[in-house]
Amino acid sequence: MILAFQLSVFALVAISFLLVVGVPVVLASPDGWSTSKNAVFSGASLWIALVFLVGVLNSFIS
């Protein structure tokens, strides 16, 4: 269970870093938003799911 928690926290940190770097790049590029809108929304949805997963797994660990 601890390994699943650690992997989910690592995934959350990695996705957060990618979104922090990637979203401004997409928004700054010409015609970037219309071509990468689905990727940004997918990343944000994955981030929200990981936040809830980390919260649930944390309740089992603590």
UniProtKB/Swiss-Prot annotation:
GO aspect biological process, one term: photosynthesis
Q: Give the UniProt family note.
A: Belongs to the PsbZ family.
The protein's predominant localisation is plastid
| Quaternary structure (record) | PSII is composed of 1 copy each of membrane proteins PsbA, PsbB, PsbC, PsbD, PsbE, PsbF, PsbH, PsbI, PsbJ, PsbK, PsbL, PsbM, PsbT, PsbY, PsbZ, Psb30/Ycf12, at least 3 peripheral proteins of the oxygen-evolving complex and a large number of cofactors. It forms dimeric complexes.
Q: Which InterPro entries match?
A: PSII_PsbZ (IPR002644), PSII_PsbZ_sf (IPR036512)
How is this protein named in the record?
Answer: Photosystem II reaction center protein Z
Entry GO CC: chloroplast thylakoid membrane; photosystem II reaction center
Q: Which domain of life is it from?
A: Eukaryota
Annotated transmembrane regions: 8-28, 41-61
Matching entries from Pfam families are given as: Ycf9 (PF01737)
Query: What subcellular compartments does it reside in?
Result: Plastid, Chloroplast thylakoid membrane
* Keywords on record: Chloroplast, Membrane, Photosynthesis, Photosystem II, Plastid, Reaction center, Thylakoid, Transmembrane, Transmembrane helix
Q: Specify whether Manganese is a keyword of the entry.
A: no
